[in-house]
Amino acid sequence: MHELSITEELLKTIVAKAEEAKARKISRINLVIGEYAGVVEDSVKMCFDILSQDTMAKGALLEFKRIPAEFRCRLCGHTFPSGQHALVCPKCQGWNAEVIAGNEFFIESIEVDDESQSS
């Protein structure tokens, strides 16, 4: 399960950024995941819940925004969404398409409680 190593790095990055901002606690993390990123949301959530137990991210809400796959035909330049025959261009029927969206996986934003706020 590669989600474990992905989530470990994700947590390190999130905690480091929160510490830079002098945050007291991380409350929400907004992630962007492309349709073809090969990342399973439920697995990331499960790993995050376990790995974040002794960190400022414990109990933080993970939100996922899915980006649909989009392709560009290398023959005619037409762009099109994924479908039943994702790699076949619907315009020229060519089989030479490249993925131009849908491979993303990144942190969109982190919401924190700063040190100046009281509990």
UniProtKB/Swiss-Prot annotation:
One function term, GO molecular function aspect: nickel cation binding
Keyword Metal-binding carried by entry: yes
Keywords attached to this entry: Metal-binding, Nickel, Zinc
Residues the record lists as binding Ni(2+): H2
Gene Ontology biological process terms in this record: protein maturation; protein modification process
Cited function: Involved in the maturation of [NiFe] hydrogenases. Required for nickel insertion into the metal center of the hydrogenase.
Protein name: Hydrogenase maturation factor HypA
Native source species: Dehalococcoides mccartyi (strain ATCC BAA-2266 / KCTC 15142 / 195)
Lineage start: Bacteria, Bacillati, Chloroflexota, Dehalococcoidia, Dehalococcoidales
Gene: hypA
